[in-house]
Amino acid sequence: MLGAMFRAGTPMTPNLNPEGGGHYFIDRDGKAFRHILNFLRLGRLDLPLGYGETALLRAEADFYQIRPLLDALRELEASRGTPAPTAALLHADVDSSPRLVHFSARRGPHHYELSSVQVDTFRANLFCTDPECLGALRARFGVTNEDRAEGGPHFRLEWAPRPAELPEVEYRRLGLQPLWTGAPGEPRDVVGTPSFLEEVLRVALEHGFRLDSVFPDPEDLLNSRSLRFVRH
């Protein structure tokens, strides 16, 4: 019935359902279908800039046999071409160095106790030739004081999770900072190499990369120090 609306000379019988009032009700998902209705109203294909659901829209148009819309989609895709994912390289290196920190803890009005705790500092270097993937990695991680001015294909991070034994004031005095990931309202601390590389792996797979090498132990992915991803 919907396809008939686009074909001149096709008789349209009224809806005989008493609840329809002589009109037709179209119950479809609005994600792509609203563009079909816009095409019906305007007589032209008017899609947002960068619209990436043309395959879904074409499937809907084919289902309803809307030939003018199918023709318009073919013209659009021919003008755009079909961009294939470009070849790219992603390399993630993580290094950790332990540090013994001494601090004094107040145990009473005139009682101070000297304590020590190990603090692990992590340094990560991400190299990616795909700017979109690198941007996603930058957005994935957050630190308190971060310089994002670094350009090119590199992205470097340094963080040190605070041990429970180390007071917050001493942690800040030492100039240490945590690293977190996740939504702004629900941040999760990145406590070490495995959790950091897990997030890198997620982003890499989301952008079409595949794992190419693991160092030093190929059998122990998340406890490695270096991951290399490629996209052909």
Swiss-Prot record:
Q: Which GO terms describe its molecular function?
A: transferase activity
Matches recorded under SUPFAM superfamilies: POZ domain
Q: Does the keyword Transferase apply?
A: yes
Keywords from the named record: Cell cycle, Developmental protein, Growth regulation, Transferase, Tumor suppressor, Ubl conjugation pathway
Which GO terms of type biological process are on file? positive regulation of neuron differentiation; protein homooligomerization; protein ubiquitination
Metabolic or biological pathway, per its Swiss-Prot or TrEMBL entry: Protein modification; protein ubiquitination
| Residue ranges annotated for the BTB domain, each copy included | 1-49
Q: Out of the domains of life, which is the source?
A: Eukaryota
**Matching Pfam families, A to Z?**
BTB_2 (PF02214), KCTD11_21_C (PF19329)
Q: What is known of its domains?
A: When BTB domain is deleted, growth-suppressing properties are lost.
Q: What does this protein do?
A: Plays a role as a marker and a regulator of neuronal differentiation; Up-regulated by a variety of neurogenic signals, such as retinoic acid, epidermal growth factor/EGF and NGFB/nerve growth factor. Induces apoptosis, growth arrest and the expression of cyclin-dependent kinase inhibitor CDKN1B. Plays a role as a tumor repressor and inhibits cell growth and tumorigenicity of medulloblastoma (MDB). Acts as a probable substrate-specific adapter for a BCR (BTB-CUL3-RBX1) E3 ubiquitin-protein ligase complex towards HDAC1.
| Subunit relationships | Homopentamer. Interacts with KCTD6 and KCTD21; KCTD11 and KCTD6 or KCTD21 may associate in pentameric assemblies. Component of the BCR(KCTD11) E3 ubiquitin ligase complex, at least composed of CUL3 and KCTD11 and RBX1. Interacts (via BTB domain) with CUL3; initially a 4:4 stoichiometry has been reported, however, electron microscopy revealed pentameric states of the BTB domain.
Could you tell me what this protein is called?
Answer: BTB/POZ domain-containing protein KCTD11
Q: Which organism is it from?
A: Bos taurus
